[in-house]
Curated annotation (Swiss-Prot):
GO terms for molecular function: 2,3,4,5-tetrahydropyridine-2,6-dicarboxylate N-succinyltransferase activity; nucleotidyltransferase activity. The lineage of its organism: Bacteria, Pseudomonadati, Pseudomonadota, Betaproteobacteria, Neisseriales. InterPro entries: DapD_Trfase_Hexpep_rpt_fam, Hexapep, Hexapep_transf_CS, THP_succinylTrfase_dom1, THP_succinylTrfase_N_sf, Trimer_LpxA-like_sf. Its main location: cytoplasm. Homotrimer. The keyword Acyltransferase applies. GO terms for cellular component: cytoplasm. It comes from Neisseria meningitidis serogroup A / serotype 4A (strain DSM 15465 / Z2491). Belongs to the transferase hexapeptide repeat family. It catalyses: (S)-2,3,4,5-tetrahydrodipicolinate + succinyl-CoA + H2O = (S)-2-succinylamino-6-oxoheptanedioate + CoA. This is 2,3,4,5-tetrahydropyridine-2,6-dicarboxylate N-succinyltransferase.
């Protein structure tokens, strides 16, 4: 049986799987899947085009199964002790392994095993959860969190305190995705499988979930669940039908193409909106 088939079959019987009852075949299949996620050979979601992604549900199933086949144990990274089922990604790495991986991880940065961090990434004191994928050149700034299975594109900047939500269940749901060359402003939260399409700028303190209305003030269109490519987004509000109150929304104040985005600083894009 293929790795995927073993995982799919085991997941159907997951209620019966414990650290003591799991078969050697299933345990090795789960651990191999986690190893492939950790190395970047396998991804929870694969990009088909701008805003279009295919979810590998079986990889998410393997992550969920990994919690069932392992007991909590004391983990020690040389500085702190933890009690968990998932070791940190580079707790026992040598200097050569760090050099080969090609990213920086400053003191206080935590990534769980089963997450992938590409070359030229900088991890400030931050957290990257299992199943996540952080692509080349990304910056994960101080106290930013990358949730389980989240996909972070090339050259993305996650500013201080940003939260990128994790999505393990429902299995068919897409993870939260930040596509290439996006900027996410400080303390913003992107959650519940929202896709921020490439080249977008999210201002400081913007909160976007699946139910958040994203209003394009130029066209009058309202989006939910995705931020169109090249959008510059700030916090706003929309009046109720009777005008008695307003509710939070995100507002697309302008669109920029890749050429403009490359030549213009984030502050300039947000100035005079």
């Amino acid at each position: 049986m293929s790795l995927q088939n073993i995982i799919e079959t085991a997941f159907e019987n997951r209620a019966d799987i414990t650290p003591t009852t799991v078969t050697p075949e299933v345990k090795e299949a789960v651990l191999e899947t986690i190893r492939q996620l950790d190395s970047g050979k396998l991804r929870v979601a694969e990009r088909l085009g701008v805003g279009e992604w295919k979810v590998n549900e079986w990889a998410k199933k393997a992550v969920l199964l990994s919690f069932r086949i392992q007991d909590n144990e004391v983990l020690n990274d040389g500085v702190n002790k933890y009690f968990d089922k998932v070791p940190t990604k580079f707790a026992d790495w040598s200097e050569d392994e760090f050099k080969n991986a090609g990213f920086r991880a400053v003191p206080g940065a935590v990534a769980r095993r089963g997450s992938f961090v590409a070359k030229n990434v900088v991890l400030m004191p931050s957290y990257v959860n299992i199943g996540a994928y952080v692509d080349e050149g990304a910056m994960v700034d101080t106290w930013a969190t990358v949730g389980s299975c989240a996909q972070i594109g090339k050259n993305v900047h996650l500013s201080g305190g940003v939260g990128i939500g994790g999505v393990l269940e429902p299995l068919q749901a897409s993870p939260t995705i930040i596509e290439d060359n996006c900027f996410i402003g400080a303390r913003s939260e992107i959650v519940e499988g929202v896709i921020v399409e490439e080249g977008s700028v999210i201002s400081m303190g913007v909160f976007i979930g699946q139910s958040t209305k994203i209003f394009d003030r130029t066209t009058g269109e309202i989006y939910q669940g995705r931020v169109p490519a090249g959008s510059v987004v700030v916090s706003g509000s929309m009046p109720s039908k009777d005008g008695s109150h307003s509710l939070y929304c995100a507002v697309i104040v302008k669109r920029v193409d890749a050429q403009t985005r490359a030549k213009t600083s984030v502050n300039e894009l947000l100035r005079g909106i």
